[in-house]
Amino acid sequence: MAVPKKRTSKSKTNLRKTVWKKKALKQAIQAYFIASRASKKLNLEKAITKDLNTES
């Protein structure tokens, strides 16, 4: 089994964690906005079909 020869410094560990967390945060924000746009579009379509049904 592979074992590291030297201990990784705390600063390097924190740096890697920070990079990973920033990537995760960026993806979470992107997913939120995509879901938000999809929700708004769905609500708009429902409103339009509701208006069309009431006019008839």
From Swiss-Prot:
Keyword Repeat: no
Primary site of residence: plastid
Subcellular location: Plastid, Chloroplast
UniProtKB keywords: Chloroplast, Plastid, Ribonucleoprotein, Ribosomal protein
InterPro entries: Ribosomal_bL32, Ribosomal_zn-bd
Keyword Metal-binding attached: no
A single MF term (Gene Ontology): structural constituent of ribosome
GO biological process: translation
One Gene Ontology cellular component: large ribosomal subunit
Similarity comment text for this entry: Belongs to the bacterial ribosomal protein bL32 family.
Name of protein: Large ribosomal subunit protein bL32c
Origin species: Tupiella akineta (Green alga)
